[in-house]
Design a protein with these regions (language model features):
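A short Gly-Trp-Pro
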Residues: 1-10, 15-124
Length: 124
């Protein structure tokens, strides 16, 4: 993927903007009780490598379950932009919702289906 503008995404209203360090090779579509409601398509990056503008001033968070990560959404339009660990560790990951990026970026990514509702394994 050489088209640099494809690495820039935002929520619907533009208050939260994300820039990826590189195009992802893979993304995950999870069917857990939260991800299936969010319609998230998650690409993973080392925490701190994705530039996120408008966070935290324009975002709200949702923390649930084992309380190890926060799901982040725009306070204005409600789009979920990413999730991040509550206690980041060196080399730790966070997930970016590719649905906030140009659809051509998604077309270039292998999507893996993850059974977060039951077996916690990939099902593809």
């Amino acid at each position: 993927m050489t088209d640099e503008h494809l690495l820039h995404g935002s929520c619907h209203c533009g208050a939260v903007r994300l820039t990826l360090p590189s195009a992802p090779e893979k993304a995950t579509k999870c069917n857990c009780s939260l991800c299936r409601r969010l319609c998230g398509l998650w690409a993973y990056y080392e925490f701190g490598t994705v530039r996120i503008e408008g966070h935290p001033e324009n975002t709200a968070e949702y923390i649930w379950g084992d309380k190890t990560l926060r799901n982040v959404r725009c306070k204005t339009c409600g789009c979920v932009t990413h999730w991040e660990p509550l206690a980041p560790e060196p080399g730790g990951k966070h997930g970016v919702n590719l649905n906030n990026f140009d659809p051509r970026l998604q077309e270039s990514v292998q999507v893996r289906r993850f059974d977060g509702a039951d077996t916690w394994t990939f099902i593809d």
